[in-house]
Amino acid sequence: MHKSLINPNGNWIAAANHLIGDEKALAHAIIISVRGSAPRELGANMLISENQIWNTVGGGSLEFEVMEQARGLIKEIGLKVEGSNRKVLNLALGPDMGQCCGGNVKVLLEILSQSDIKKLAKHSQKLVALEHPLKSGAPTEVLRTDDDKKFRPFLKKESFVLPTAKKLDPLFIYGAGHVGRALVKIIEHTDFDIHWIDIDEKRFPEGSTSTFSKVIALDPALIASHAPSNAYHVIITHSHPLDEAICFALLSKDQFRFCGLIGSKTKNSRFRSLLSKMGIKDEQLKKLTCPIGIDEINSKQPVKVAIWIAAQLPIWQETNGIRIG
């Protein structure tokens, strides 16, 4: 049985440390080159052990071939030379894979032993990049890198530089009701650092999780006013006065990536009028997205509402703040 593990922060070293268990070695597959159309981007990576996987390099025939080659490599060379077991696959997605993408990808396979992973584990809590040799040697930390390339994978002549974790955008979700619970379930494994806020601890689901930070706050607006300027905000509380206070805190400070409020067109008009009377200027009000979510879905079922909010979040991310109003 092939079990897939998901690490919410995309930190492959932490995932490897969890995945290795009692196994002697696992394979780390990295897409180091992409030409033409391909199912995943440069730097996409996955971990492969005998019975488990973490993440994906694109699924389908491509991933099946990578997994077969990786498991074959583990069995073939075992642990003869720790840290130096690696191979580059050159895969044409049309002829070789029978896929319609038609592009070409190169995948680096590196075999990591338990000791290799333990040595790397010290990096798992930091946003750093590692340099992965294409021919021999163990991954090494990139000590000097400019900010622009720090979180971007790139190919060098004899190695590939890969961040140990993705740079996550801060997302503040206000409200742990039906929609809030459904929304977090949908987006907890996306590229967001989730801060989930409510005034009552009982509203949160039971059990602990590493996929979000739970914040119990008597004054959520105070949390909003201290959020970083690159944060995304989704306001879906049970209370209109709470919604109003959070919106006012965010719009008056005017330092955020996106501010989305759940509600009808009537609520939107009412809130804009109230916020205007409270001193929020028209230019600031234009940055409030209400109703939040894509327009094509009109259902009021909590799960469907959560789906259309979740669908808008990556649009916000990828357009970097262009869609407002």
Where are these regions (language model features)?
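Adenosine-phosphate binding glycine-rich loop
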Residues: 262-325
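ADP-ribose/adenylate-binding Rossmann-like module
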Residues: 197, 237-238, 249-274
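Structural motif
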Residues: 170, 232-233, 258
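Cytosolic regulatory regions of ion transport systems
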Residues: 241-242
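Short amphipathic alpha-helix with an adjacent loop that forms part of the alpha/beta core around
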Residues: 219-229
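A short acidic, amphipathic alpha-helical/loop segment
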Residues: 183-186, 245-250
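Segments forming oxygen-rich coordination pockets for charged ligands
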Residues: 1-199, 206-212, 273-274, 312, ...
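Conserved SAM-binding strand-loop segment of SAM-dependent methyltransferases
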Residues: 212-218
